[in-house]
Amino acid sequence: RIVFKKKNKTKFKIKTICVGNFYLGGTGKTSLSIKINNILKKKKIKSCFIKKYYKNQTDEQKILQNNGKLFMSYNRIDALKSAEKENYDVAILDDGLQDKTIDYDISFVCFNDINWVGNGMTIPAGPLRENIYNLKNYGHIFINGNLDNINNLKKETLKINSSINIHLGKYKPTNLGEFENNCNYLIFSGIGNHKTFVSMIKKSSLKILKDIEFPDHYNYTKKDIDEILDEANSLNCEIITTEKDFQRIKDFKESKIKVLKAELNIIDEDKLINLII
């Protein structure tokens, strides 16, 4: 049930947590959304995902569906209404920071520490949906990746908004035992943060002979997969990809391609828990 409207924004009875970004793609929105949902489930809070439907984002949609209840619509307000009808307590919106029709209870602006703000310019001159100085309008920023340069990124952030809450996260492989350290690997992905994927594998002591980067949400063809298999065969390599990419290639039923699964570990998770519950 809608409670009220304020300045053309709709406020819902259900608690709304928006996990969005400024940088186009690869900022860990889906990973953070899943992490928040898992935290709420452990606390016995009935939570769900909300996502606006985009035809080219079936990979993210399937991953969210594998991790909880997903309400999806061409309009986020309609999806939120459906969640309220089913008596959910919390709605986690994967993307939607620039949707000014909803009055969110909590908003996170997500960044990847490698991509950061790119050239610092907004679309079409750069990768940003909003000017970086708009951080002054938000209360929470989430930075994820290997965090090697995190002190400088914190300083840049606090110069813009000295009161913003900075949350940090690192990716950790969860199925490393399925991979041999004495093998060589060809890795490929079509995600927004390919460099973070590469960095995580290198830090896991797996040897990469070749990495291939495709565009974000890339729609693989049989020809693409055959070329990857041929390349790996010529290099005498095993093949690794991401969970998101696997959602887009599993119809090819190619058993030689292995998936490296990863989870997001929140640094100071108690701080996040106290915020969202």
Model regions and ranges:
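Structural motif
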Residues: T16-C18, I92, F108-C110, F142, ...
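Walker A (P-loop) phosphate-binding motif
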Residues: I2-N56
